[in-house]
Amino acid sequence: AMAGTATVQGQGTR
């Protein structure tokens, strides 16, 4: 998963 806003993968910077 890549950093940033939440994606369809359900990961990201929160």
Curated annotation (Swiss-Prot):
Organism whose genome encodes this protein: Pseudotsuga menziesii
Keywords: Oxidoreductase, Peroxidase
Reaction catalyzed: 2 a phenolic donor + H2O2 = 2 a phenolic radical donor + 2 H2O
EC number: 1.11.1.7
GO molecular function, one term: lactoperoxidase activity
Domain of life of the organism encoding this protein: Eukaryota
Record-given protein name: Peroxidase
Family in the record: Belongs to the peroxidase family.
Signal peptide region: none
